[in-house]
Amino acid sequence: MPSLVAVIDDDHAVRESSESLIRSAGFAVRVFDSAEQFLKSPYLRKAACLVLDVRMPGMSGPELRRKLLSEGYEVPVIFITAAADEEAKARELTNGAVAYLTKPFDEKELLPAIDRALKSGSRRDHREDRR
């Protein structure tokens, strides 16, 4: 079964194009229009990687990541944003994000970031299995 990638973005066009791109690369993908929708979904703890919009109405991508971490759910995260903010980028990468991409991004940016995220998640899972 392919790894599940969850895309959480309030922009319909970004969700649609990301879903198509990720699916064409052979991954399972689910899209959500808000952090709150993702939190209520049956896919909450099934995603192997999250692609999160930084700025969304309601809970932002970084807020969602912090909430998940506070609940013990560590999942690799790729942030996407329309606003280039080097300070926010540095902060999120320092805090463990796999990538921080500025829209519009393309497959040469997103797909390698997803591969890195899934590999980092796989290494973490193996470490937890040995405990």
Residue positions per predicted region:
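Two-component/phosphorelay signaling modules centered on CheY-like receiver
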Residues: H12-R30
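Acidic catalytic/metal-coordinating carboxylates
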Residues: D33-S34, S60-L64
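Active-site beta3 strand of CheY-like receiver
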Residues: R45-L52
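Receiver (REC) domain active-site loop signature in two-component systems and cognate sites
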Residues: M56
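Alpha4 helix (beta4-alpha4-beta5 surface) of REC/receiver domains from two-component response regulators
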Residues: E63, A84-A99
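C-terminal output helix
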Residues: F105-D115
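The C-terminal output helix
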Residues: D115-R131
